[in-house]
Amino acid sequence: MAHLLVVESWVGSMSRLLPRAIRENGHAFTFLTRDLHHYLRSAPEGTAHPLLGARNVITADTNDIEALLPEVERLHGVLGFDGVVTSCDYYLPSVARIAGRLGLPGPGPQAVENACRKDATRRVLDDAAVPGPRFAVREEWADIARAAREIGYPLVVKPVDLCAGMYVRRVDDETQLAAACRALADFPVNARGQRRTPVVLLEELLDGPEVSVETVSHAGAVQVVGVTDKSVGGAPAFVETGHMFPAALPPGETEAAEQTALAALKALGLTDGVVAHTEIKLTSAGPRVVEVNPRPAGNRITELIRHVTGIDLAAACVDVALGRAPDLRRVDTGLRSAAIGFLVPESSGTLEALDGSGVRDLPGVLEAQLAEPGKAVKAAGSNNEYLGHVMAGDTDGPGARERVEGLLDGLRAGLVIR
C-alpha cells in the first residue's frame, strides 16, 4: 500500500474519481487543504463524501508555497508520502514543487508552470516551432488595442491563469475587446483566493473543429490513449457542450493531432509522470495547439475513455505519481464510442422544471445527472454553469454523440427557467 498526499481538488467529478482510483488500487491518501468548508459545501448527493476515505485531512495555507514546502516536509517526516497529486489546475505547479522538494516522482516544476500559464505555453511552443495561433501578451490597454489590430479581428481574449473557459471570449472589434478586458480586470482573484496575473493573452481566432489528445507519460515515454472530440457553444464565450471518444476523424487527421500534441509535450518537457489533456484545433492549415493541460481531462472525458477502452486515466495518474508504470492495456468493453452532452442554460433565473424521469433507464444511457428544481441558474459563460449531463454509448460505431444529442433535445423540451 502506498500513501499519497492529495493537495486540494476540484469539487466536480474528479473529486470522486481520483479518491476512487487511490482506494481501488489499495492505496491511502492524506488530503491537504486551506479551506475544508469549500468541500463540505459541495458534498455530492446520493454518495458518501470522497473525503471520508482520507486517512488524514490537514489544513494548511496551500496558496503560500514558500511556507507550505517546509510544512509538507515536516508532515512527510511523520506520515511518509510516496507520491503527491492534485486534480485542481490551480495547484498543479505547487504539487510539482512539493514532489521535487520531497524527492518524489513527478514532472519538472518549470514544465508544469509553463503548461499552466497560457502565456508561457505560447512562448515555449513558439520557440520550438510547434504550430499555434498568432498571439500577443499585453497588460496596458493601449498595448492591448495595438496588438489586437496587428493580429486582426476577430480574435480570442484569454486570461493566462484561469480554467474551465472562464473569461475566454471571441471579440470582433475594439468595443468588444474593451468589454472583455474590463470583465477580466474585474476578476482579480480566482475562486481559490489566489491573486491573478493582470495580463491579457490575445490569440488569432482559429477555424475548424477542436479535439483533445489524451496521453500518459512515464519514464520518458509518452503514450497516446486516444483523441476526443469537442462541441462548443455559448458564443461569444467558448462553453464545452459535449464530447465523444474516440473522435470520428479520418486516420490522417487523428495522426496529425496526435503528433502535434506529442511535439507540444516534448517542447514543454512533460514527458515523465504526467497524464495530459492537450487541446488541438484542426484548422484548414493543419493542427494548431490550443492548450496543454498537465492533468487528466475534465468533464468526465476520463469516464468516456474507461467505458470504451477499459483504461482508467485517474488510476494512471496515481500510478505515474508513484513512479510506477501505468496499466494502459485495452479491453473489449463492448462499446465502440461513448459521448457526453451537457445541458447548458441560455438564460438566468430559477430552475422551475427539468423532467429527467426515465432517462437513466433508456437504452445505451450510461449516466444521467440533472439539477433539481429550485436551483439558481446563471446563463452559461464558462464550463461552470451546467444544469447536468447525459452520457451514452454505442456498441456498433461512432453513434454515441447522435444518441446524446437526441436525449438532450428531449430534456430541453421540458426545461423551464424563470
How would you name each of these model-derived features?
Residues 138, 168-173, 216-218:
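Short beta-strand-to-turn element immediately C-terminal to the catalytic PLP-Schiff-base lysine
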Residues 1-111, 142, 371-385, 393-418:
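ATP-binding N-terminal substructure of ATP-dependent carboxylate-amine bond-forming enzymes
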Residues 131-133, 154-157, 171-207, 240-243, ...:
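Conserved ATP-binding module of the ATP-grasp superfamily
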Residues 203-270, 282, 293-316, 332, ...:
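ATP-dependent carboxylate/phosphate-activation module, predominantly the ATP-grasp catalytic core
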Residues 286-287:
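Conserved protein kinase catalytic/activation segment
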Residues 127-128, 318-418:
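Peripheral (often C-terminal) accessory segments that flank ATP-dependent C-N-forming ligase machineries
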Residues 101-167, 191:
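A conserved helix-loop-beta module that forms one wall/lid of the active-site cleft
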Residues 125-126, 148-171, 189-208, 213, ...:
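ATP-grasp fold ATP-binding core
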